[in-house]
Amino acid sequence: MSDIPPDLHYTAEHEWVRRSGDDTVRVGITDFAQSALGDVVFVQLPEVGAQLTAGESFGEVESTKSVSDLYAPVSGTVTAVNTDLEGSPQLVNSDPYGAGWLLDVQVSDAAALESAITALLDAEAYRGTLTE
């Protein structure tokens, strides 16, 4: 079974969200997603400062098997991207919840972030999507 940390929030598109500040989150793909993708060879991410809209594509992950779109779990501004993935995209496979993170997003304010996180899946609900 895939590793699903209980302290994170999830999307049906197999991304995770970790609150990292009052109005910021860190985003990555789940263990299930990296396992399904196979060996990741390239990650395309937006520039710092880019505006994301929840539910819309913001980049892609390319593996030896396929290319998959990444979808924004929340709306906001990209404040950081994981530049380590440029030279080491395999970090998405080896440490999807740590060194393989994708980007940080700042939401307009703490209330907006609270609302956005509430709309995401908790670990148990995400686990349920994997067994359907």
From Swiss-Prot:
Keywords (A to Z) from UniProt: Lipoyl
DNA-binding keyword on record: no
Required cofactor names: (R)-lipoate
Pfam families: GCV_H (PF01597)
Signal peptide feature range: none
SUPFAM superfamilies named in the record: Single hybrid motif
GO biological process: glycine decarboxylation via glycine cleavage system
Record's function text: The glycine cleavage system catalyzes the degradation of glycine. The H protein shuttles the methylamine group of glycine from the P protein to the T protein.
Subunit structure: The glycine cleavage system is composed of four proteins: P, T, L and H.
Protein known as: Glycine cleavage system H protein
Source species of the chain: Mycolicibacterium paratuberculosis (strain ATCC BAA-968 / K-10)
Lineage: Bacteria, Bacillati, Actinomycetota, Actinomycetes, Mycobacteriales
Name of encoding gene: gcvH
